[in-house]
Every structure is written in C-alpha cells, then in structure tokens.
Amino acid sequence: MKEIENKKMYYFVDESGDPNFFNKKGEDLVKKGNVSKVFILGYLETDSINIISKNIQNIKNEIKNDHYLQDIPSVKKSLLHLHAKDDCPEVRQIVFKAIEKMNIKCHIYVARKDSNLFRKKFNAKQSKFYEYMIEKLFENRLH
C-alpha cells in the first residue's frame, strides 16, 4: 500500500473569458459577439510556493533591469502585477520561459458557451453555470 505524503499544497484558481450569456434585457450576448465564446476555469497546483515566489521576484528584476524593456509603457505596470492580457509580448516570453522550469501542475476546464444549453441545463442562472465549472475542474482531483 502506498504511503500518503504529508505535504502542504497550494492552489491558485483563475478564469478567462466572460461567464455572461445574456444582458439585463435578455439579449444573447454570445450570439451578438459581445462576450467570449468560451469560458475557461483553471488552477495551478504546487508545493513549492516559496521557490515560485522567488522566481516571480527574479522575473520582475530581470524585466526591470532589461534596458530594451524599460521604454515600453506597460512594463511599469508589469513590475507591479504580471498579467498576460496586459503584458507586452517580450514580458510574456520571459514569464513563459520561467514557468516551464517551475514545479507546478495546471488543470483547466473549458466550456464552449451555448445559450440554448445554458437555459436548459442551468436555468439561465450564471451561478449554477459557475458552480458546475468549479465541480468539473476539481472533479477527482482533491481527496
């Protein structure tokens, strides 16, 4: 029988896309193209939080000390808060190369947004849709 490891794990949950399907008037925002056609929910799992924190600080130092990047307006914001949608491609490349070396696991769940299915399965309630996404994301993952 395999012995259970006793180590502390850390989970960071994030989403991408807009979970909305309809506006307040009941108009289908997905069909109109006013919101994303997919909604993604994911998490990062690690037991190396201190190492990852140091790596992120090293990334910020590398960006701060790169003379080429200093003239890019968005870099000042990146030094405070890294976020792929706001960071310039050069910063994203530095971050992605560093992520490859980190001790992390990522799990994602992607939903294609279908307004008819949303009405039938979730009674057009965003909270039920989000709850379903969370359940699917963590299904058979946490013990």
Give, region by region, the residue ranges found by the protein language model.
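Phosphate-ester processing/binding pockets and catalytic centers
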Residues: 1-143
